[in-house]
């Protein structure tokens, strides 16, 4: 049951107020100040998202109650952790990113089940397997800059994430930090399953994600996202074509790269190299004629493919 004080704070947070009320709000505990935020805490009347500052609506500015709680735990803001938990935030999510003994004790006192061992990995996998916008965003917020993953087998974790994302997240396993790997993982899962709310959130919160967003759009054959990413990302058309050819039936990605000037003969050979014969025939329809090179390449792979090419 909510306390009278909790209900009163919720009532105040859902109403409009002027700057003259700011001193009262600070005393009342409805103020959030950190390196990026400094303003009154509000609850959106339309979606119940948490807003900080002067915004008439929460679009682009709000965060769910769970996300607000996770961020408060990471900042070790005891009063806000208590406030958001009282308002209905899931303190179990907070416990997953409580990196100090004092915050772990606080989360436990508020009802969280202390996570141990594989619970961290199980939570990461669960939040991505639900294929839900909110769970992907929660997963990103919980495990971004979370030192609890320092104790896991990083090579094994990187391989697992790459297999689940279905798109190469890095060139080599030792050439990317875990933080960046996880950011790419959450983004790739959102693009792969067309979770538009999560994509929009990551576009606004993950720094320098645009080059990888173009790679995802090419790999998952999304011409609209390719066009959007190409406005801000300058990638060589042949590199774009190489990405497009890695997944079979990527006709729109191949055609987009071809229109930008990619070598269609090289695309034909790359498609054959990756074993994507539908892509190869599409390249031939676009004018590719590297049959001699393709025959030699196919001969190294399978004799049956060689015969098929030469027939």
UniProtKB/Swiss-Prot annotation:
Keywords (A to Z) from UniProt: Early protein
Disulphide bridges: none
Stored Pfam families: ASFV_360 (PF01671)
Gene Ontology biological-process entries: taxis
Organism superkingdom: Viruses
Triggers of expression: Expressed in the early phase of the viral replicative cycle.
Known function: Plays a role in virus cell tropism, and may be required for efficient virus replication in macrophages.
Family classification: Belongs to the asfivirus MGF 360 family.
Name this protein carries in UniProt: Protein MGF 360-16R
């Amino acid at each position: 049951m909510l306390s009278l004080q909790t209900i009163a704070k919720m009532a105040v947070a859902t109403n409009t107020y002027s700057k003259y009320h700011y001193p009262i709000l600070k005393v009342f505990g409805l103020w959030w100040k950190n390196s990026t935020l400094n303003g009154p805490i509000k609850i959106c009347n339309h979606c119940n998202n948490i807003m900080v500052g002067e915004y008439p609506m929460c679009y682009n500015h709000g965060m769910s109650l769970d996300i607000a709680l996770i961020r408060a735990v990471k900042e070790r803001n005891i009063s806000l952790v208590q406030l958001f938990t009282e308002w209905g935030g899931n303190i179990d999510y907070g416990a997953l990113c409580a990196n100090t003994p004092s915050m772990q004790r606080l989360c436990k006192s508020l009802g969280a089940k202390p996570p141990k061992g594989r619970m961290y990995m199980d939570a990461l996998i669960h939040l991505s397997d639900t294929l839900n916008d909110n769970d992907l965003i929660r997963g990103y917020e919980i495990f971004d800059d979370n030192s609890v993953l320092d104790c896991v087998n990083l090579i094994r974790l990187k391989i697992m994430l790459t297999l689940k994302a279905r798109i190469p997240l890095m060139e080599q396993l030792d050439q990317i930090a875990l933080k960046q790997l996880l950011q790419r993982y959450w983004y790739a899962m959102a693009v792969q399953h067309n979770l538009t709310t999560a994509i929009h959130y990551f576009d606004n919160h993950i720094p320098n994600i645009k080059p990888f967003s173009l790679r995802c759009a090419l790999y998952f054959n999304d011409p609209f996202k390719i066009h959007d990413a190409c406005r801000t990302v300058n990638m060589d058309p042949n590199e774009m074509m190489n990405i497009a050819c890695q997944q079979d039936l990527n006709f729109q990605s191949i055609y987009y790269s071809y229109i930008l000037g990619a070598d269609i003969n090289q695309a034909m050979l790359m498609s054959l190299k990756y074993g994507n014969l539908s892509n190869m025939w599409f390249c031939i329809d676009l004018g590719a004629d590297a049959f001699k090179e393709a025959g030699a390449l196919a001969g190294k792979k399978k004799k049956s493919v060689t015969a098929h090419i030469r027939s």
